[in-house]
Curated annotation (Swiss-Prot):
Residues 595-832 form the ABC transporter domain. This is ABC transporter A family member 12. CDD domains: ABC_subfamily_A. GO terms for cellular component: membrane. It comes from Arabidopsis thaliana. The lineage of its organism: Eukaryota, Viridiplantae, Streptophyta, Embryophyta, Tracheophyta. It is a multi-pass membrane protein.
Length: 917
């Protein structure tokens, strides 16, 4: 027994879930291969790790270490690190600050000093008290270079030393201390050729005197301006004018020491220099201003002696680089993102092949579709990432083992949901699988490369604004990369990431960004799907709150009725009658007819300078339950546009239609629950059997249990797909005719109230066609059927009424006998003779029908239309027998008007009228 009530949300969800499980069972190895992709990729990492370990083993040979000298990469132990003198970072002589067009300060040296190499180095001062600034600046530099080789570092610390070379990555060695590089002693003034030899360990170098200038500026704004313009990027001339350091003494006095220090951070800027992070020579700047203040308070003999810089002793460095942590962000970004094209192409494939819309036409709501599809993709995604983490941990990758598994689970769970939501969002924009596949893989690999070569450098650059980092993380690919980068950093440090590290690592912000984007993307994707795919009003979520029940018929206004009268005189009598019948039914509020089309119109907008195209011109039509209405018409007449509006593929430009009392403009989702559709092209899953198709669509029609089994069996038998186990074979193995029969069976299962059949017997052999016609004829007992066809035989056999559609409008309507009687009031007389007897044939026809009209003439064969009112069939036979005695007649015939003749006549007449108009 078929359940007449529509399927509930959970019934629809159950139907789709069962269908998807069946479909995935047939693709089980595809899913297994997908889930095993992480294992394959982890094995590649393991192989690379083993090769790298073998290479590092040779490099790590401690026999190459001698004393405290380290190999490249710093693998040797250093039990006694060297003591290094502290120095200031000073610019090279051609980069030092001088007078320029964009620097108006008169106390700067002339730029000619750059040619002689005698430019001083400059330190700027500002603050609230000028006298204090003058006093402190006078105490900054020592007036001479004094050193005692027997007590080298303490005596060297009394001098202010500087280097033009940037500091190293650590203090085990200083690149500024080399035999070919001088060290500078900064003094208030220098005598000519002030150079001193200096021995630092095994390195023989020289100390050169360089003048140091301490200049006062009125406020910190001036200091900032001078520092900014001193960079080659900060002035229009592109000319460097570098300052050593700057001090803002602010409120410093004898009781308070409050100083801000400016220094050049570009020397350790990896993003700017393209080199590894380096130390900056800031400690000596702090020591200088501190000593100057102490001398101001206590006299010249008071100071804090800054003797040397020294690293802690270092053990041997094991050369066992963890490749997973090194390549992790880039590699695992690609691994996780590989799911995005899989999900996206799956969604777009259903859209491209119109599988989703055919499911919707048979009653599948948007809610169940979204829920089941989302749950499936989430399940696959979680199995995929669990496989990734599990296999990575099993083969010993520290990247996974050291980081807290619960943090990893939450991270991958949130991103998987975000990725699925984005796939739904992007799928609403595209309709071609090939296009979206190319775009998806470009995004996958582009995201990884940009993350590695751009975004990671920004993260590691301390001076890069945090706000810009957060802004870039709004792109989901970069938020994924940031999370994976933090995992790799914590894993390489040895401890791994714990929950208490979220605020320190930036993972907390990543979690928040991804969570918010997950929900926003899901909401926007659903909104776009409802507006652009389902055709709802942009404010449908507000309209639903205030709309009145749409099932109540609307009574036309007086203005609306008057506007219709303009067209009545232009229509044929039968079309006018149909219009009046529909208007009467609407005025009376009748809901007895299964289908009522009320002034239904569809206009396609003009393109490329062409005018708008009127596809359906104000159609009025009523179809009652138990009736099969056939639509005939030439190609381009508007039949497909009409069916598309009735099935929800297109929105009417104006007018409406009621199906079972429900307005297709407002209640299409409810209409779908009582509708069956056989589209012009078979929309089937190639790997599902005919039985599985019918089980799925039967469940959507709320058929359950034994009723479902019985309905499926009867459907298979009725369309001859039962015998020989045909119904249990994949639909991809069916012939075109078998697929057509299955599509018809799908449209009829569950006894829908309304069925649309678009050329249902296309591609069938005569026997199968007759059988299918009988199936449709039996099914229409309690169903309203609208059928489009080009077969006149099919139309006569199945249809209770016919309508001929030309240029978007009904030209006539009625049953086949009425149409033939109305438009075919003549016989067709055909005779074939030799060409020399053609005139005699014409005289014969004129003798039996003076008003006959020749309609065909070719090589001795002629056809004539004979008006029925002036022709007696017996006279025609006698005339032909008499003619046979005079000349040879090869063939002749007399036929009544066929439906095809009517169709051709009506179509030609209508098109001729339209052309004249």
């Amino acid at each position: 027994m078929v359940n007449p009530s529509p399927a509930s949300f959970w019934t629809q969800a159950n139907a789709l879930l069962r269908k998807n499980l069946t479909y995935q069972r047939k693709h089980i190895w595809t899913n297994v291969r997908l889930i095993l992709v992480p294992l394959f990729l982890c094995l590649i990492l393991l192989a690379i790790q083993q090769v790298l370990d073998a290479l590092m083993k040779g490099v790590s040979d401690m026999s190459n270490c001698g004393g405290n000298v380290t190999l490249p990469g710093g693998i040797c132990p250093i039990p006694n690190p060297p003591s290094l003198p502290p120095m200031l970072q000073i610019p090279q002589h051609e980069l030092r600050s001088v007078k320029t067009d964009f620097f108006s300060y008169k106390d700067l040296p002339d730029k000619l000093c750059r040619e002689t190499g005698s430019c001083p180095v400059t330190i700027l001062f500002t603050g609230d008290k000028l006298p204090l600034g003058k006093a402190l600046s006078a105490n900054i530099f020592s007036t001479s270079f004094v050193v005692n080789s027997s007590d080298l570092l303490p005596t060297l610390a009394n001098n202010v030393l500087g280097s033009t070379e940037a500091a190293g990555e650590d203090n085990y060695e200083d690149p500024g201390i080399a035999s070919d590089l001088p060290i500078y002693s900064i003094q208030p003034s220098c005598s000519a050729n002030s150079t001193w030899p200096l021995s630092l360990g095994q390195i023989q170098t020289a100390v050169k005197c360089v003048q140091g200038l301490c200049l006062w500026r009125n406020n910190s704004v001036e200091v900032n301006d001078e520092l900014f313009k001193g960079s080659w990027r900060g002035n229009p001339a592109g000319m460097p004018n570098e300052i050593v350091a700057a001090y803002d003494l602010m409120s410093t006095d004898r009781k308070n020491f409050n100083v801000t220090i400016w220094y050049n951070s570009t020397y350790n800027d990896e993003f700017a220099t393209g080199q590894a992070l380096k130390l900056v020579r800031v400690p000596r700047s702090i020591n200088l201003i501190s000593n100057a203040y102490l001398k101001f308070l206590k006299g010249p003999g008071t100071r804090i002696l800054f003797e040397f810089l020294k690293e802690v002793p270092k053990e041997e460095t094991k050369m066992n680089q963890d490749i997973a942590s090194l390549l992790g962000p880039l590699f695992f970004t690609w691994v996780v993102l590989l799911l995005f094209p899989v999900i996206l192409t799956s969604l777009v494939y259903e859209k491209q092949e119109r599988l989703r819309i055919i499911m919707k036409m048979h009653g599948l709501g948007d809610g169940p579709y979204w829920m089941i599809s989302y749950a499936y993709f989430l399940t696959i995604s979680m199995l995929y990432v669990i496989s990734l983490v599990g296999f990575g941990s099993a083969i010993g990758l520290k990247y996974f083992r050291r980081n807290d598994y619960s943090i990893q689970f939450v991270f991958y769970f949130i991103y998987s949901n975000l990725q699925i939501s984005l796939a739904f969002l992007v799928s609403s924009i595209f309709s071609k699988v090939k296009t979206v596949t190319v775009i998806a893989y470009i995004l996958v690999y582009g995201t990884g490369l940009l993350g590695s070569f751009l975004f990671q450098k920004m993260i590691e650059t301390q001076s890069f604004p945090e706000e810009w980092i957060l802004a870039m993380e709004l792109y989901p690919g970069f938020s994924l990369y940031r999370g994976l980068y933090e995992f790799s950093q914590y894993a390489s440090r040895g401890n791994g990431m714990k929950w208490q590290d979220l605020s320190d690592s930036g993972m907390g912000e990543v979690f928040c960004i991804m969570s918010v984007e997950w929900f926003l993307a899901l909401i926007v994707a659903y909104y776009i799907d409802q507006v652009f795919t389902s055709g709802k009003h942009p404010f449908f979520f507000l309209v639903n709150l205030f709309k009145s029940p749409s099932s109540l018929p609307r009574r036309p206004t007086v203005q609306r009725l008057d506007s219709k009268r303009v067209f009545i005189d232009m229509d044929k009598h039968d079309v006018t009658q149909e219009r009046e019948s529909v208007q009467k039914l609407r005025n009376e509020g009748s809901t007895g007819h299964a289908i009522l089309c009320d002034n239904l119109k569809k206009v396609y907008p003009g393109r490329d300078g062409n005018p708008p195209k009127m596809a359906v011109r104000g159609l009025y039509l009523s179809v009652s339950s138990g009736e099969c209405f056939g639509m005939l018409g030439p190609n381009g007449a508007g039949k497909t546009s009409f069916i598309s509006m009735m099935t929800g593929l297109l929105k009417p430009s104006s007018g409406t239609a009621l199906v079972q009392g429900l307005d297709i403009c407002k209640d299409m989702n409810k209409v779908y629950t009582s509708m069956g559709v056989c589209p012009q092209h078979d929309l089937l899953w190639e790997t599902l059997t005919g039985r599985e198709h019918l089980l799925f669509y039967g469940r959507l029609k709320n058929i359950k249990g034994s009723d479902l089994t019985q309905a499926v069996e009867e459907s298979l038998k009725s369309v001859s797909l039962y015998d020989g186990g045909v119904g249990d074979k994949p639909a991809g193995n069916y012939s075109g005719g078998m697929k057509r029969r299955l599509s018809v069976a799908i449209s009829l299962i569950g006894n829908p109230k309304v069925v649309y059949l678009d050329e249902p017997s296309t591609g069938l052999d005569p026997a199968s066609r007759k059988n299918l016609w009988n199936v449709i004829k039996r099914a229409k007992q309690n169903t309203a059927i609208i059928l489009t066809t080009h077969s006149m035989e099919e139309a006569e056999f199945l249809c209770d009424r016919l309508g001929i559609f030309v240029d978007g409008g009904l030209q006539c309507i009625g049953n086949s006998k009425e149409l033939k009687s109305r438009y075919g009031g003549s016989y067709v007389f055909t005779m074939t003779t030799s060409s020399k007897h053609e005139e005699e044939v014409e005289r014969l026809v004129e003798s039996v029908s003076p008003n006959a009209k020749k309609i065909y003439h070719l090589a001795g064969t002629q056809k004539f239309e004979l008006p029925k009112q002036e022709v007696r069939i017996a006279e025609v036979f006698r005339a032909v027998e008499k003619a046979k005695a005079n000349f040879t007649v090869f063939a002749w015939g007399l036929a009544d008007t066929t439906l095809e003749d009517v169709f051709i006549k009506v179509a030609r007449t209508a098109q001729a009228f339209i052309s004249l108009s």
